Amino acid sequence: MSKPTLCVIVPVYKAAATLDRCVASVLAQQVAGGLHCILVDDGSPDESGGLCDAWAARDPRVTVLHQENRGVSAARNAGLAAADSEYLVFLDADDALRPGALQAALDAQNTAPQSFVLWHYTTDEQDAAAVTSDIATRPQNTLARLWLDCLLAMPWNKLYRTAAAQQLAFDRQYTLGEDLQFVLDYIDLLGRTAPDFAYTILTAPLTFYDCSREGTLSTKYHADYCKIWPEHFARLNKACYAAHCPQEDMRPLHRAELTVYAEGVADILRRDPAKRRAVRRDKADAALRSPWLHALLERMRIEGCYSAYYLPCRWRSIRLVWVMAEARRTGSPLFGKLDWAGYYLLGRRLRRD
């Protein structure tokens, strides 16, 4: 097979129910210069590996790599090493590409050769929005805004130059949020090779994202959640300050960081496997005493940035963090009442914007 323009890397693990939809969406793409699909079977215990082989048997554009179960980062790294194209895209086995997605991404790249191309996604499989070539260009100092717009943290809504991406790797030490580190590594590399690059964003949703997957905070408990996310946020903040992101973006970023962390603390109380309640409370209390959290709260105070979780975390009130997180999770109006109560208790000195 001659060298294709674009390669799609799909890590596969227990994906028998969705793999056919995923691969069919890739192979249906019309790409000038051709495409290659690499399926990496990460030691899946179900019939996923056989399904991968069946696709390779009937379509020469499909290559299958089988490996022992080592996690999604190792699977992506294996696919990355095998990629033989000018550009590449990552796709998860329970997601799908919308018709025309890959050529739209390539067209955007050709329009702005020095840019980093990203696109929106949809969680509605029946979304009828047309795939168009409409783009928005953003400068490098909108990095924090990309996070706030839910465009930054994932690897599968971006077009990568294969030669550049192959200089990097997904960090296997992380069990959560490792995608963000890879994306930031790529942006850092791009900034060194093309200092004047910009972000080119396709406004149409090109990927269907199945948000019912396991692994999010809402579906899976991570014992090291309150350790991992501060590390990711420290890296993100460093990149944002280096990009000179404006305060009007940094304030909501810090607010979002506090929300992620506080709700991780509440999740310790709700789902930590420790049988004794006192043990769970001790873990939550330790998380609320984190130096990273103290530094974040102090930064927010200096910036004048309010969050509903600001006072509960400042007071290290396990009970109040729990009540607010549960109210937000269940959609209770109590969350809004406590949010505004904290705002007025602070004399409206901190900003809500």
PLM feature spans:
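Flexible acidic/His/Gly-enriched loops in nucleotide-sugar-dependent glycosyltransferase catalytic domains
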Residues: 98-174
